[in-house]
Amino acid sequence: MSFNNLDTLYRQVIMDHYKNPRNNGVLEDSVTVNLNNPTCGDRIQLTMKVEEGIVQEAKFEGEGCSISMSSASMMTQAVKGKKIEEALQLSKIFSDMMLGKEYDDSIDLGDIEALQGVCKFPARIKCATLAWKALEKGLNEGK
């Protein structure tokens, strides 16, 4: 697939998650994390049910750009059913990808790969990582 076709596909995936967010909403009696990006105004509330060391459910609500909201949608899909350690590993891989670092590409990132081009735009990295930082905070505080 040519670079332009791949770029177009990634853009479509991002916009699909933005316009049709997965796992949008709030879970009652859950781990709750509120974060915002004061630079651009993005904000997210992440709620998760974690039982026996596994992320059973994850939902988010927020306001922000297409990158921050689609990243939150992708993240909630990716971490459901994962052990805490696996979810944190996925977050580390995503962070490394955003920072242009080497990362373990043996793990299938699914739709998350659509965000890899964000690393070319340093001002947008905080948008893409906001939900992931909420995930890390919630999982680390919930231990």
Model-identified regions with their sequence ranges:
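Glycine/charged-rich beta-loop-alpha catalytic/anionic-binding loops adjacent to active sites
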Residues: 49-60, 109-116
